[in-house]
């Protein structure tokens, strides 16, 4: 379910979630009671040097990109924890991308705020401005190129299955098409043409990382998080430990005292 949701979010929450992005997953396995951490964050491109790391290049535009890790992570968790095929979990996302969904105001606002950057690239114009303008909230929004990419990944899996490969091998075939095949070459071409840094070599080197999560307790609850992120992770656990001794109920929800404590 998590993999299916993430694929669909690539379309319906594109400014925050994408198979071309990066992320962290903390997973509770009910059968064993174990908790796992999966780092789906790609590395910075090898070609990125200190002189290129400016406030402008690191925050927006083609040069801000790092190796996309989420798709590889989704394949890894689907293989290790899931039962369904990639074809099954990608089916909803492909359907929405082909047939459309009523685009929401938040996504429209985001596209509008990034219009100047998006219009620099014909592929972005084709995807984000299908009518030549910023979409209007409530309009049916399709993304045919996204559907095509998702279908290519499913095709790699299904072709492997038809040739007698195992489920794990078939999922690996989809992984390889993204990170080592024609999709990786398309990444390479785009970044070269637009003075970016990501190369096919960067993509080929990527692997998701499974790790032991960091852990603490908070008022009788076990709290787990990723050891490999600065947003959340150990920082959040430390914050919980720091406020545990305060009587937040007595201080009052959203009171000045409570907000001051949490902000500090």
Predicted regions and their residues:
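Noncatalytic scaffold domains of N-terminal-nucleophile
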Residues: 2-173, 178-227, 231
């Amino acid at each position: 379910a998590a993999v299916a949701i993430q694929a669909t979010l690539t379309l319906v929450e594109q400014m925050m979630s994408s198979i071309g992005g990066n992320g962290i997953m903390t997973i509770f396995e009910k059968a064993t009671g174990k908790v796992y951490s999966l780092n789906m964050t790609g590395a910075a491109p090898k070609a990125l040097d200190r002189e290129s790391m400016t406030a402008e290049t690191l925050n927006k535009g083609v040069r801000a990109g790092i190796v996309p890790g989420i798709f590889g992570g989704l394949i890894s968790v689907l293989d290790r924890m899931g039962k369904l095929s990639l074809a099954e979990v990608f089916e909803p996302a492909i359907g929405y991308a082909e047939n459309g969904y009523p685009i929401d105001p938040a996504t429209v606002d985001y596209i509008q705020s990034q219009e100047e950057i998006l219009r620099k690239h014909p592929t972005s114009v084709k995807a984000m401005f299908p009518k030549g303008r910023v979409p209007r909230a409530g309009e049916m929004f399709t993304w045919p190129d996204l559907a095509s990419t998702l279908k290519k990944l499913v095709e790699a899996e299904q072709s492997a299955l038809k040739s007698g490969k195992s489920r794990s091998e078939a999922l690996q075939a989809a992984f390889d098409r993204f990170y080592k095949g024609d999709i990786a070459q398309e990444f390479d071409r785009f970044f070269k043409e637009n003075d970016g840094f990501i190369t096919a070599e960067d993509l080929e080197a990527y692997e998701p990382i499974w790790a032991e999560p960091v852990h603490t307790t908070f008022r009788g609850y076990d709290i787990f998080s990723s050891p490999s992120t600065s947003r959340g992770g150990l920082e959040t656990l430390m914050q919980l430990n720091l406020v545990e001794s305060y009587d937040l109920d007595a201080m009052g929800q959203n009171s000045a005292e409570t907000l001051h404590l949490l902000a500090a």
